[in-house]
Amino acid sequence: LWKEYSTNSEYEVIVMPLPYYYKNIDGNADYSEDTGSYPEYVKLTSCDEFSYDKANPDKIVIQNPYDELNMTITVHPSFYSRNLAIHTQELIYIPYFKTDEIDEQDMRAYFWTKEYITMPGAVYADKVIAQSEGIKRLYVKKLTEFFGKDSEEEWNNKITY
């Protein structure tokens, strides 16, 4: 995705690794930053150097759907999906992981999809890009169960693959 957009002169692509916090059992959090896992050719922008108000990005792509709901790790609240959504015309969520295709008849696997599907990043995003048609159907079904039958069309429209 980065290569596709960064070579197109119509786009200005900014890659901003977010600092994150490991949550301790006592409720405190330890600050951490991971900039070493990016290829050298990717120009990184520090979140301290970036202003959403000045940049007014057309699109923001996120990979972390959890916001404050992850029990072990979080980012600063200013980077939660609901806050990013107000700074862009289109918030796009692309899961950072690939999963096996899930058979809805496998109740254990289906049950645990709630841990990554019904999360704020998918809910607040204007567009969700799933890995396949089957995973899109899974997202639509799970989110419709969570929010009610009247929401099904919304999920069908905003989730793609």
Label the model's feature ranges.
Residues 1-157, 161:
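Active-site and donor-binding regions of nucleotide-sugar-utilizing enzymes
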